[in-house]
């Protein structure tokens, strides 16, 4: 429980929220006849522009034999199109001063360019060419496959990344939601050029594609270019996957490159489409900032870790409430005990000052996000894919403002009724599984009856 120091101000009124509810809603969506959506954040007078294409195709949409194929396609999109080879793609973007980026997630792939507002239309044309007309030259695929295998080696050498991979497996078993986006060494080595072409044809359709622009041009000015570049796509059906079922369990793996214990501990929470704002507030209550209970107690007062984070991840197929950090093997039992004790304590009572802090921290984060066009575009695109609509500024802030202490306490109490998933990499003392099971019993928390101490 966080004590209220004598010099702390009284709990602040709600005016900071009220003053921000009426921020202008500058986001618009237009849908083409084939289902392609044009998402525009209008920024009059802005000298720069952010242009993105989001494809509803990621790791969760892949068959097991093609694990990592979305990520390979993302890499290969820049290696040649119907009108440009790899070098021409790089030159055409860089002669305009454009920054080019792309990434693959579980639920979508993003292709992004940021440049001068005067170059908005050329950037749109380039993205249409790269995303819709890649040629996947065999010689480029052979080279890029090696690059991706090196990237995979980096991931495998990172105890933190391995801990998250093990956590996903403990939480969701063999569901596609648990598979690593980068794939496996065997699947990457086996992918062929025809596999890439087939997968793109299956997944890239109008209903699964969003063209997004943040800059000074209006949607009306952009529509002709979007129609020309993307209007020929077949509409297709939305790429959908059944939600993941939470399993829970323990995964521990020794990682020779780490002298610490990397810990990822979590429980199931609401999916994104279930719109449960109390989950995010609960994560902020427990672990946002140095004065939060997790950091104040486990780091500042007990010195159990340097890095501790609490996050509520709500995605299309599942949600997870996670406490993650790194500690020494000797302090691992105390770190686990302290984390569970704080969760159990907050399932009984949430302090007003912690709720005040969390709400204001989330408010400030929301304001910072408004200043990051790429982040706003991606967040809005995910809303369109999952919810079929945008959540405006007022809706988001009113949802945050509506969360009270009882809502946070109740959400923590509810998540603790489910079996946790725990992943530990690096070093862990002998008997860690049994110790964790004993802690769960002590705090009257459930352990998965199917595989309580899985390895």
Feature map (PLM): residue ranges:
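Charge-rich, well-structured scaffold segments of protease-associated domains
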Residues: 1-13, 27, 31, 42, ...
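Short loop/turn motifs at secondary-structure junctions and domain boundaries
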Residues: 19-22
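Short acidic-hydrophobic surface loop/beta-edge motif
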Residues: 28-33, 252-256
């Amino acid at each position: 429980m966080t004590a209220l120091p004598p010099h702390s101000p009284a709990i602040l009124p709600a005016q900071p929220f009220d003053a921000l509810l009426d921020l202008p809603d500058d986001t618009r969506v237009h849908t083409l006849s084939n289902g392609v959506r044009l998402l525009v954040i209008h920024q009059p007078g802005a000298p720069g522009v952010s242009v993105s294409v989001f494809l509803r195709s990621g790791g969760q949409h892949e068959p097991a034999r093609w694990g990592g194929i979305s990520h390979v396609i993302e890499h290969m999109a820049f290696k040649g199109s119907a009108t440009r080879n790899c070098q021409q793609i790089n030159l055409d973007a860089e002669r305009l001063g454009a920054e080019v980026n792309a990434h693959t997630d579980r639920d979508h792939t993003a292709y992004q360019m940021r440049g001068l507002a005067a170059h908005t239309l050329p950037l749109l044309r380039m993205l249409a060419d790269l995303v819709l007309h890649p040629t996947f030259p065999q010689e480029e695929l052979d080279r890029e496959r090696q690059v991706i295998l090196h990237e995979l080696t980096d991931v495998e050498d990172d105890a933190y990344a391995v801990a998250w991979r093990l956590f996903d497996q403990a939480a969701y078993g063999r569901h596609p939601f648990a598979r690593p986006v980068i794939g496996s060494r065997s699947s990457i080595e086996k992918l062929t050029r025809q596999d890439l072409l087939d997968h793109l044809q299956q997944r890239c359709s109008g209903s699964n594609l969003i063209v997004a622009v943040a800059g000074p041009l209006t949607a009306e000015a952009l529509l002709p270019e979007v129609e020309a570049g993307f209007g020929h796509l077949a509409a297709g059906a939305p790429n959908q996957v059944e939600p993941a079922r939470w399993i829970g369990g323990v995964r521990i793996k020794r990682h020779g490159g780490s002298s610490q214990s990397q810990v990822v501990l979590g429980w199931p929470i609401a999916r994104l489409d279930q719109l449960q704002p109390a989950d995010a507030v609960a994560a902020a209550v427990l672990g946002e900032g140095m004065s939060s209970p997790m950091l104040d107690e486990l780091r500042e007062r007990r010195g159990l870790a340097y890095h501790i984070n609490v996050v509520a991840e709500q995605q299309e197929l599942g949600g997870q409430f996670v406490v993650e950090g790194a500690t020494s093997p000797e302090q691992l039992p105390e770190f686990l005990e302290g984390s569970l004790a704080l969760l159990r304590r907050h399932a009984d009572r949430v302090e007003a000052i912690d709720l005040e802090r969390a709400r204001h921290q989330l408010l400030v984060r929301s304001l910072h996000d408004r200043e990051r066009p790429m982040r706003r575009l991606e967040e809005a695109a995910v809303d369109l894919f999952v919810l079929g609509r945008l959540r405006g500024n007022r809706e988001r802030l009113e949802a945050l403002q509506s969360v009270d202490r009882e809502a946070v306490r109740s959400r923590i109490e509810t998540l603790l009724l489910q079996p946790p998933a725990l992943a530990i990499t690096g070093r862990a003392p002998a008997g860690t599984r049994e110790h964790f099971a004993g802690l769960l019993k002590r705090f009257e928390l459930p352990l998965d009856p199917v595989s309580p101490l899985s390895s």
